[in-house]
Regions:
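Intrinsically disordered, low-complexity, mixed-charge
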Residues: 1-101
Length: 101
């Protein structure tokens, strides 16, 4: 672990379970990601979950994962947030953060 680990660019996919559809979760997720300066995307899945990918500094991504795991949108009830495909990047692949359909 180096001094600059917090500024290392990382990418991770997520899936949020619980009462997360029909409560504007994707909109609030996009807004939060943009506040943090993250790149990536989010969408509703056919399984009733929210899925997406976030990229940014390790600190930014950890902040977003905390939001996805504990806060969410008003009216949401998060059961859990699963992460997968964590990787370090030389640079972000995404410019901005979008809602996919």
């Amino acid at each position: 672990m180096g001094v600059d680990d917090a500024h290392q660019i990382v990418s991770v996919e997520f899936e949020v379970y619980g009462h997360v559809q029909g409560v504007y979760f994707t909109k609030y997720c996009r807004d939060r990601a943009m506040e943090l300066g993250l790149g990536g995307w989010v969408k509703n899945s056919k399984r009733g979950t929210i899925v997406g990918k976030v990229q940014g500094t390790k600190d930014q991504v950890e902040n977003m994962v905390n939001w996805l795991s504990r806060t969410g949108s008003p009216g949401s009830k998060i059961e859990r947030c699963e992460l997968r495909d964590f990787e370090y990047l030389a640079r972000q692949d995404f410019r901005g953060f979008s809602i996919r359909f």
